[in-house]
Amino acid sequence: MTHKREIQGVVVKKSGDKTASVLVTRSVLHPKYHKTVKRFKKYLIHDEKNELNVGDSVIAIECRPLSKTKSFRLKTIVATGVK
């Protein structure tokens, strides 16, 4: 069985039917200055039931490519955003 990557982030945009854009933040150590800096990346995730809203905190799991840019599907909703 293969290991599937999991990402945790915040929904920043509803990108069409059954798709949401999730912003993932990670901390890395700067190679020269040895200070922790934040790095950001957006992923498109598949939301089969259209249950996500902007501001929700979610966990997504890697899956087979569903489109040109979408390779993650929704696993759980950790917290709901502001209504």
UniProtKB/Swiss-Prot annotation:
**What protein name is recorded for this chain?**
Small ribosomal subunit protein uS17
Q: Which domain of life is it from?
A: Bacteria
Q: Which organism is it from?
A: Aliarcobacter butzleri (strain RM4018) (Arcobacter butzleri)
Question: What quaternary structure, including any partners, is listed in this protein's UniProt entry?
Answer: Part of the 30S ribosomal subunit.
Q: Which GO terms describe its biological process?
A: translation
The GO cellular component terms are:
cytosolic small ribosomal subunit
Q: What does this protein do?
A: One of the primary rRNA binding proteins, it binds specifically to the 5'-end of 16S ribosomal RNA.
Instruction: Identify the gene encoding this protein.
Output: rpsQ
The UniProt family comment states: Belongs to the universal ribosomal protein uS17 family.
